Every structure is written in C-alpha cells, then in structure tokens.
C-alpha cells in the first residue's frame, strides 16, 4: 500500500472489493496503485467496532469519550499525525475519522480530548 509505505495483506470485504477494482483497472491499462486507507467494522453483540488505518507504528494513543459509557474513540498518533482510529459505538464520528486519517491530519492530544471541538472542523 503506497499510502502506508508498506506491503500488507488485509482481509475485509471492503479491501477485497477495492483491490479487485484496482486489478481490473490494471488489466485495462490504468496502472493507478492501490493506496486507500484500510478500514474495517464488526458488530459484536450490542457493540459496533470500527477501525481505520494501521495503528502498529503509533507513539501516542488518546481516548475521546467515556469508556464507562461504552461509546468512545481511540486516536493513534505518530509525531502528532493521525494514523489510525478505533471507534466503539461511535459510527457518526467514525465517518469523519476516516477522512481525518486519509488526510493525515496533524492534531494534538488536547484537541482530541476536548469534547467541545467538532471533529468536522478539523477537516478544514
């Protein structure tokens, strides 16, 4: 994955569909590399888990929301750049987080923790 700067095997419905489109385009002569930010979701009983990005190379993890309410997000940062987000029962915020990770937004932990900050405003 060019965007992640590594080779990576991912198994998800979305990834399989998008990579098959890339292969078909390559066969047709359009050699655009596959460089989408990976994302996944899973429903586990009454919890919706959603993940975007690859968090393995982070140097900071910041929680937004309350774990006790079982609705929160974990933001994974590397040198203040947002590289991944794990969302628990936070589907609306997750849609914004997908864009934030794709745009490689630089963000401070204080801003992430501040519930008065609208995540949409960080896309500007």
Segments the model singles out, each with a brief description of its role:
Residues 68-124:
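C-terminal auxiliary extensions adjacent to catalytic cores
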Residues 1-91:
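Mid-to-C-terminal Rossmann-like scaffold of FAD/NAD(P)H-dependent oxidoreductases
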């Amino acid at each position: 994955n060019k965007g992640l700067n590594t080779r990576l095997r991912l198994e998800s419905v979305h990834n399989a569909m998008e990579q098959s489109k890339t292969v078909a385009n390559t066969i047709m002569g359009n050699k655009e590399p596959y460089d989408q930010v990976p994302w996944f979701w899973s429903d586990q009983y009454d919890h919706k888990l959603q993940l975007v990005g690859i968090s393995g190379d982070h140097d900071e993890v910041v929680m937004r929301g309350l774990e006790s309410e079982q609705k929160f997000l974990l933001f994974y940062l590397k040198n203040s750049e947002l590289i991944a987000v794990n969302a628990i029962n936070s589907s609306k915020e997750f849609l914004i987080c997908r864009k934030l990770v794709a745009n490689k937004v630089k963000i401070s932990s204080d801003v992430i923790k501040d519930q008065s900050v609208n995540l949409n405003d960080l896309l500007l």
